[in-house]
């Protein structure tokens, strides 16, 4: 039980709230639900890497924007460390997912990777090991999607310097939840 509370501490709960709610999944899905798709396929299907990528991007965005700085500089620094830990975890999860499905990773190596290199609590790592065995490439969507969304936002910021941050993010979220490569075309 203490492993659970070490993992889900105050800073993790703030980061998780950003990821799952605002401005993460809840905001992204609200925009997606308002989108009027031109085809039934666009209305039904969505990109997992875009959805998870947006949520991971939102974690970084909030820290960069000063979330928790109003509480104290220590709270803001602790949240930054948590956000970086989660970003490291997304990279390690991607490595683990690929290596497991390429038959190049056993349980003991996966646990060592997650616990020793990724600072995951053992209880969390056991759950992740089960998850990687039941899904294929889903754990990669967080990091791959984050990189795609981050790069898209950076390119839009460069190409449309007159846009406010809100205009930029509304444009990214306003086309539903397509794969980022298609979103680039839609925003061109």
Language-model segments: residues:
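Long, His/Glu/Asp-enriched segments that create or flank divalent metal/ion-associated functional microenvironments
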Residues: 1-188
């Amino acid at each position: 039980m203490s492993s659970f509370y070490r993992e889900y501490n105050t800073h993790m709960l703030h980061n998780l709230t950003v990821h799952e709610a605002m401005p993460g999944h809840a905001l992204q899905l609200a925009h997606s639900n308002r989108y009027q798709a031109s085809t039934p396929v666009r209305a039904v299907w969505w990109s997992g890497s875009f959805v998870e990528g947006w949520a991971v991007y939102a974690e970084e965005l909030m820290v960069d924007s000063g979330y928790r700085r109003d509480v104290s500089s220590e709270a803001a620094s602790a949240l930054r460390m948590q956000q970086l830990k989660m970003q490291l975890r997304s990279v390690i999860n991607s490595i683990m997912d690929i290596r497991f499905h390429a038959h190049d990773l056993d349980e003991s190596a996966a646990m060592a990777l997650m616990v020793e290199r990724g600072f995951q609590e053992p209880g969390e790592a056991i759950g992740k090991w089960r998850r990687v065995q039941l899904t294929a490439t889903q754990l990669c969507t967080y990091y791959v999607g984050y990189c795609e969304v981050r790069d898209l936002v950076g390119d839009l910021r460069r190409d449309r310097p007159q846009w406010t941050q809100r205009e930029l993010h509304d444009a990214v979220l306003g086309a539903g939840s397509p794969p980022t490569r298609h979103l680039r075309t839609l925003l061109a």
